[in-house]
Amino acid sequence: MAPNLRKSHPLLKIINNSLIDLPTPSNISAWWNFGSLLGICLLTQILTGLLLATHYTADTTLAFSSVAHTCRNVQYGWLIRNLHANGASFFFICIYLHIGRGFYYGSYLNKETWNTGVILLLTLMATAFVGYVLPWGQMSFWGATVITNLFSAIPYIGQTLVEWAWGGFSVDNPTLTRFFALHFLLPFMIAGLALIHLTFLHESGSNNPLGILSNCDKIPFHPYFSLKDILGFIIMFLPLTTLALFSPNLLGDPENFTPANPLITPPHIKPEWYFLFAYAILRSIPNKLGGVLALAASVLVLFLTPLLHKSKQRAMTFRPLSQLLFWTLVTNLCILTWVGSQPVEHPFIIIGQLASLTYFTILLLLFPIIGALENKMLNY
């Protein structure tokens, strides 16, 4: 009998073991769809980004008008741009839900998978930041100025580092060209990291909603989960296309319709919605270096979650106290996001400070304490 090419060919074998014959827990819910959704988001962003790059000019005098030209004169240029801009929002929605699922169901105990995932998040954040600068509107310019300036808080080497990043003494043409180069490069790095992420995941196999071993009950990935993923793609593309076609500027800042002007500062400098929680934490500390450290810690704290797991159970499915704490954390993040979009004045300052304190307290103190407490309760 002729060997099955899918199982014998060196390249097809890898695809087969990852997407076709992969043994998958039979009870994984729709929360496990977000990994594949992130993959399709990345593909969409690379495709639309490539098409946009063919019409973009990375020069301070031409960048803004080249984006306007793409929207006005290029066939479906407006649609490509709207899909790319809103696709970034959906990318972040998916990654935040993906992280939330990992946190809730204890998937972070696959340490290598979790750590590469956090590195992926950081790379995605960097990509989105440099990408936001490219249209060279007011918020692009001032966002780049404010965020890159944060590096000057690093003692001794800070100022040199910032000027090195800028390629001069302010955000200017060299900054824009290097940001374009980085924005082109980083998505391919994300794709490479995603493969590493998957390699680590397939070492141990997926977790499941019960947080228990599922070796006794696994089913092939195809056709069950391949079809489930395709359904997920359809469900995600519907709101994405609706947003891109009906209200493409809903999530953007109107300030970015004004070309960059170093002489006029916008009244409220704020990043896109998906960075607002971190921006609120940054602003809640009156000291520059302290704010930068808190900003970095707000994401880097994810590296510590596997070490802070004190419960005997993996998932939160049967841990009501941890569940309560988890949803408090989610609410807290929503409050931080809202505060980040508000001006720096009373009562937003104190709300932001309390929410920032709560964020770190829940993650670093309350979760391990409640985990240990639930262990005690199990013994009674």
Swiss-Prot record:
Residues binding a ubiquinone, per UniProt: H202
Disulfide bond residue pairs: none
UniProt membrane topology term: Multi-pass membrane protein
Biological-process GO terms, alphabetical: mitochondrial electron transport, ubiquinol to cytochrome c
Residue numbers binding heme b b562: H84, H183
InterPro entries: Cyt_b/b6_C, Cyt_b/b6_C_sf, Cyt_b/b6_N, Cytb/b6-like_sf, Cytochrome_b, Cytochrome_b_C_euk/bac, Cytochrome_b_N_euk/bac, Di-haem_cyt_TM
A single cellular component GO annotation: respiratory chain complex III
Alphabetical keyword list: Electron transport, Heme, Iron, Membrane, Metal-binding, Mitochondrion, Mitochondrion inner membrane, Respiratory chain, Transmembrane, Transmembrane helix, Transport, Ubiquinone
PROSITE patterns in alphabetical order: CYTB_CTER, CYTB_NTER
Residue intervals passing through the bilayer: 34-54, 78-99, 114-134, 179-199, 227-247, 289-309, 321-341, 348-368
Function in brief: Component of the ubiquinol-cytochrome c reductase complex (complex III or cytochrome b-c1 complex) that is part of the mitochondrial respiratory chain. The b-c1 complex mediates electron transfer from ubiquinol to cytochrome c. Contributes to the generation of a proton gradient across the mitochondrial membrane that is then used for ATP synthesis.
Family: Belongs to the cytochrome b family.
Protein name as annotated: Cytochrome b
Record lineage: Eukaryota, Metazoa, Chordata, Craniata, Vertebrata
Gene name for this UniProt entry: MT-CYB
